[in-house]
Amino acid sequence: MAWSGNKAAVVLCVDVGVAMGNSFPGEESPIEQAKKVMTMFVQRQVFSESKDEIALVLYGTDGTDNALAGKDQYQNITVCRHLMLPDFDLLEDIGNKIQPSSQQADFLDALIVCMDLIQRETIGKKFGKKHIEVFTDLSSPFSQDQLDVIICNLKKSGISLQFFLPFPIDKNGEPGERGDLDSGLDHLKPSFPQKGLTEQQKEGIRMVTRVMLSLEGEDGLDEIYSFSESLRQLCVFKKIERRSMPWPCQLTIGPNLSIKIVAYKSIVQEKFKKSWVVVDARTLKKEDIQKETVYCLNDDDETEVSKEDTIQGYRYGSDIIPFSKVDEEQMKYKSEGKCFSVLGFCKSSQVHRRFFMGHQVLKVFAAKDDEAAAVALSSLVHALDELNMVAIVRYAYDKRSNPQVGVAFPYIKDAYECLVYVQLPFMEDLRQYMFSSLKNNKKCTPTEAQLSAIDDLIDSMSLVKKNEEEDIVEDLFPTSKIPNPEFQRLYQCLLHRALHLQERLPPIQQHILNMLDPPTEMKAKCESPLSKVKTLFPLTEVIKKKNQVTAQDVFQDNHEEGPAAKKYKTEKEEDHISISSLAEGNITKVGSVNPVENFRFLVRQKIASFEEASLQLISHIEQFLDTNETLYFMKSMDCIKAFREEAIQFSEEQRFNSFLEALREKVEIKQLNHFWEIVVQDGVTLITKDEGPGSSITAEEATKFLAPKDKAKEDTTGPEEAGDVDDLLDMI
């Protein structure tokens, strides 16, 4: 089909004669198959925002409506839609107006009407291509009297033809066999008349073959498609193919060497256009909705203020730091302009693939028609390739952009050579995690048989097939040719909702699900290794033993006074800390494995200041919360409790209170409600002035701090004193 990047004028010429509606039981009629092909083609054009203009002409209709119609000429031919941009109305016309009739019309007459429509409606417009697509089963009679004249006018006007038939045609212009097309889906199989082709259809094939050979030569038969072949090619929505814009710049190495270059985006992450708008639910019009923004003070009267009386503020902990427009402009990075400067070189082995980041990949070429630049860049590319080196580059798109640091590595192909640029992370972009070693746990040490089984499984799941004889590597799962299922699902649902307002959305199309399945060849190869792994790694249910609680545990003697008991607990913790510190060696910072013990050790031994150690602990708390897992929530709680205890002991109450207030705001922003419920249940609140002299928080304020913001604040009553053992026995 004509889905070229150039603007095209396309006429869909559809046979709706009586024979197009005939079908055998269990088969779709030719007209239904033709409607499917046209629908898929038009919906591609709609969602790709194509500038092509499309018209719709039906022949074999009960009525007549075209500019050439006379008393006995060009009858039963209807121009259903003139040339215009495709839209959902055209899709509705294809679905509703294309129905089989009781008449027939001359195919060549319909072709003349289409040619006339293109010539008249393209006057004053620029089109790269003019195209007619014919959908027919060739059952309608036709007169070949003017065939040579039609072919001559098609060539003269630069109009190309494509035919879409219910059955395939081979390279010799003969009807194909049932086995000619290998279809993976039953509903895409070619439709063959069970009693063979009629004489009229055979005559039509000869006429179509003659026309296409006259227009396109031997390649003309490639423009004759079967409905099933077209459906397979069109079953995936495609976005418009955008031509990469050149980015000219100077590649500089030191102060004295510069090379004129031009860069193109090779890979860029495709994103949805933000086209969602709010409309009135009854009229479905955007204009019926008015949006008004009002700024109010956070007081009882909600006093309204004008936008001119407001400025931006940056929230830092519990404080808001004001920033005016002047401040924002002064804060912005002032760049000298676009830049592609080499900072230095390093071995390619030092730049690991896991460091690649960003949303695009650039290919850097020498400037066009600059021989000196081409020689210089080629020398650089080959030198890097021979030495296994890469260039570390400072990249800035323009003077408004913040600079990036990236890697440029050589890329040499038979047809061209260039540098490929990928962004690298800064220090803040890296996430460091520490995990306990599996090697130190003897229970986790695999046997040789288990290691061998996993090796075999990995080998069997390889998505690369190597042909040893031809030394060719074949990709069994080419991701660059697999459409994004998110886009496909959105387009499918938008199309369905536009045409069927009241119906439920359809399920995901099966061919999309099939594309995401592992290759059949790979699944067959990994069956045996999988069964071997299942045998060598048996899964057994672990039943957690309940801790038996004795009467002594319940009614334990507690003759110690409060302060003494607290002192005993502290000494016990210190013993534990010293033992763990001996196991870990010299502790110089708070780690992620034992953050509580590390924190206590650092502040008590005065290896680090309380401020420094607390900042390290807070960093780990934030990392634990980012995982959004209950296990790490509990670990965060242990850290917070330790922070609170040590803050009281070292008179750092205000530091802990500021942290907890900032934590609550962060929890609300990230919607970590489950974690905050744990905080409330454990009663971890602000440090009051009764607990530490450095705090100004009252007990009432500390209690209100844990109360939900959306609920009315209620006065809290003090906890009742716990009863003694005798009271408990009386209750029993």
From Swiss-Prot:
Gene Ontology CC entries for this record: chromosome, telomeric region; cytoplasm; DNA-dependent protein kinase complex; DNA-dependent protein kinase-DNA ligase 4 complex; Ku70:Ku80 complex; nonhomologous end joining complex; nucleolus; nucleoplasm
Post-translational modification: ADP-ribosylated by PARP3.
Residue span of motif EEXXXDL motif: 720-728
In-chain residues carrying the UniProt-annotated modification Phosphoserine: 258, 318, 578, 580-581
Modified residues (Phosphothreonine): 535, 716
Subcellular location: Nucleus; Nucleus, Nucleolus; Chromosome
SMART domains: Ku78
EC number(s) recorded for this UniProt protein: 3.6.4.-
Region (Leucine-zipper): 138-165
The VWFA domain, residue ranges: 9-161
Molecular function (Gene Ontology), one example: DNA end binding
Post-translational modification N6-acetyllysine, affected residues: 265, 332, 666
Domain spans labelled Ku: 253-453
GO aspect biological process, one term: recombinational repair
Domain of life: Eukaryota
Top enzyme class: hydrolase
Family: Belongs to the ku80 family.
Domain comment (free text): The EEXXXDDL motif is required for the interaction with catalytic subunit PRKDC and its recruitment to sites of DNA damage.
PANTHER family: KU AUTOANTIGEN DNA HELICASE, X-RAY REPAIR CROSS-COMPLEMENTING PROTEIN 5
Record function comment: Single-stranded DNA-dependent ATP-dependent helicase that plays a key role in DNA non-homologous end joining (NHEJ) by recruiting DNA-PK to DNA. Required for double-strand break repair and V(D)J recombination. Also has a role in chromosome translocation. The DNA helicase II complex binds preferentially to fork-like ends of double-stranded DNA in a cell cycle-dependent manner. It works in the 3'-5' direction. During NHEJ, the XRCC5-XRRC6 dimer performs the recognition step: it recognizes and binds to the broken ends of the DNA and protects them from further resection.
The protein, known as: X-ray repair cross-complementing protein 5
Species of the source: Mus musculus
Lineage: Eukaryota, Metazoa, Chordata, Craniata, Vertebrata
